[in-house]
Amino acid sequence: MSCCDETSARVPDRDVSRRALFKGAALVTSVIPAARSTSAAAQGQQIKLAYCSQLLCGVPYEVARSAGHFAKHGLNAQLVYTRGGNAAVQALVGSAVDYAATSLDVALQAYANVGADIRRFAVTGRLPLFAVVTAPNTASRIQSIKDLEGRTVAVSALGNADHALTLYLLKQAGADAQKVKFATMGVNLLEALRQGQVDVGVVQEPALTLLRRSGARVLVNGMDLEDAKHHLGGSFEFMGVAVRTKEIERRKPEVIALTKALGDALKALRAMSGDQLAAALPKEMTTGLDLKELGGIIAQHRDSLYPETVGIDLDAARRVEQSLIAGGLIKPGASMAGLHDTSIVGG
């Protein structure tokens, strides 16, 4: 139910025989070692970490893999690519992998709604990967979230995180959500918006860049920290790593090493060029993309999207919880108490 869903996943076509790993789950996955054929990696503690395969979600993990930060901290890490964040959580709960990196909304729904016994201990993303954008032909008439009353807004699906986030933004702006019509467009959202078949849409990159070039107006860019502060009240906890609760004590040295590796990757990516950032991603995930443009997009958003450290921001996490309640994705009164473990890196 997040932006890291099946429609945005770019699963690399490598070693797909590992599907059996998932104990019958209907997930198409791939596994790539953190550092191929190096003695340091071979001697390290082997771990499997699943994530949703969305490009912007995975940048810190791919930098940790390709630049050797996992190996530096004694980990022989395999990144397991799943079709969406829900699949990554299922793999974790089913003991198919050791860790799952997902958006908080996925982890929170699994924890609050179905009782998944997991703990999040590190964060690698602090903003949602969404922007609320007008169609080019409505840019002059729709200038704020309040102006969405009486308009049609395209989302990937009702109940998905883009829908929930829009409802939360409407509430924050004092707009009447009952006066807004939602259209579910799935993967056809970009073209429908560009052609003016709907008034407004909730998009990701590179759709945001393409629409801007076409003359669309950006009402809220959730990938911009200043916009998030203005419209959401601050950062909005996103990607983070979870482990099975019953194993966190046994794995504590490994968990600490993992947080250090990811922390080093977060620092490193801030100094990398766009070309270097794009090159850190597996070629199988970037086939058909303009790598120069992709690198530019990552470099443009990195200071906002990725935190300086892996420490958990509980205020940012509460904003996500409030958006899920506003969208009806978790029950009012449901608590995230116990989901976050701030003892590893603080919070």
Predicted stretch roles:
Residues 72, 224-234, 303-312:
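Short, solvent-exposed loop/beta-turn-alpha elements that line the ligand-binding surface or hinge
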Residues 3-4, 41-185, 199-205, 220-222:
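Short, glycine-/small- and polar/acidic-enriched structural segments
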Residues 59, 126-132, 216-217, 237-241, ...:
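Small-molecule pocket liners
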Residues 318-347:
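Conserved C-terminal helix/tail region of periplasmic/extracytoplasmic solute-binding proteins
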Residues 188-282:
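Pocket-lining segment of extracytoplasmic ligand-binding domains
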Residues 35-37:
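N-terminal signal peptide c-region/cleavage motif recognized by signal peptidases
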Residues 248-329:
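Secondary-structure end/capping motifs
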Residues 1-20, 29:
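N-terminal secretory signal peptides
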